[in-house]
Amino acid sequence: VVNTYFLDTSALVKRYVPETGSNWIQSITDVAANNDLTISQITWVELHSALSRRQREGTMSAGELDIILQKFRNEFETKYRIIEVDQALIESAGQLVVQYRLRAYDAVQLASGLYVKTLLMSVPETRLIFVSADNRLLDIAQSEGIAFDNPNNYP
């Protein structure tokens, strides 16, 4: 069975910045683990925002920010399968906002995960795991029939 991990930004940031769950994220994203790694195109913006906030707050230097963003840039299209944010995905996210009262970017992340779920339905021996550090988003993913995991459960 091949695991396909869909990582939202709250999970993926742990690959680039040490925090609770970083070791687990490193293990599932390691090349040797042979997992498929999928992210939403919107993660590009969200990760830049999260890391820039750390620099503004003084927990990361400008030099560290540059190094981490360069690593992410290098991995963005080589390490991850990118789910494009197109009109159909935006419409799906809009429906999720209304249905679950989600924030806009959370809805785009969930819509991206649901899109991956539909793609994998026809692929035998694959398992989708939606990974987020947001418990509410994970509860909603579960209600949509997606297996999930939270990196914060692996301190």
Report residues per predicted region.
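Active-site neighborhoods of divalent-metal-dependent phosphate/nucleic-acid chemistry enzymes
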Residues: 78-136
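Short glycine/serine- and small hydrophobic-enriched flexible loop segments
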Residues: 49-56, 114-118
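Amphipathic alpha-helical segments within well-ordered protein domains
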Residues: 48, 52, 94-97
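Aromatic- and histidine-enriched alpha-helix N-cap/loop-to-helix transition segments
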Residues: 39-45, 105-108
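Alpha-helical elements of the RecA-like P-loop NTPase motor core of helicases
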Residues: 23, 49, 91, 138-139
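Short, well-structured N-terminal submotif of metal-dependent ribonuclease cores
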Residues: 1-43, 54-67, 146-155
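Acidic, PIN/NYN-like endoribonuclease modules and their adjacent C-terminal/linker elements
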Residues: 2-4, 116-155
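Helix-adjacent hinge/juxtasegments
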Residues: 53-88
